[in-house]
Amino acid sequence: MKSLKFSLLAAVLLSVVFAFSSCGDDDDTGYLPPSQAIQDALKKLYPNATAIKWEQKGVYYVADCQADGREKEVWFDANATWLMTETELNSINNLPPAVLTAFMGSSYSNWVVDDVAILEYPNEPYTEFVVTVEQGKKIDLYFSEGGGLLHEKDVTNGDDTHWPRT
């Protein structure tokens, strides 16, 4: 009798373990790895890229990598067309002087700086510099290279991903 109870208990426990292990937290449902053409496009654009990790954001393929001494997110469409690169700057002191001066003169200069990045686009005549600040709210400030404030975006309760322009 003890043997039967033990066997039943073991069977129930094993069933529970297998049931929960099969319910993984897979956020990449439907993820398709990037094609060789997309991987080649990254190598052509950033030949020295290392620590490459691919993810899919919506319909885009994004390579998280290190290149030129900085952390980058390089965005491609399914046709291996480069759409955008976001480069982390790690500090407002890495901004161009005109952008730093504009930020320091803004009404957000006393807010906590959360993130600083450069957005580069293939078909744009300029680069955008994004300073993310927090103080009760979370705001992305987009500056031109000359220091002009292009626009601001409240990302307090929303998606703070910098998406490619379409």
Regions found by a protein language model. Give the residues of each.
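Non-catalytic accessory regions used for complex assembly or targeting
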Residues: L13-S15
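First exposed extracellular module after export/assembly in secreted or surface-exposed proteins
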Residues: G30-T166
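Bacterial N-terminal signal peptides that target proteins for export
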Residues: M1-A10
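C-terminal motif of bacterial Sec signal peptides marking the signal peptidase cleavage site
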Residues: F18-S22
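Bacterial signal peptide processing site
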Residues: G24-D27
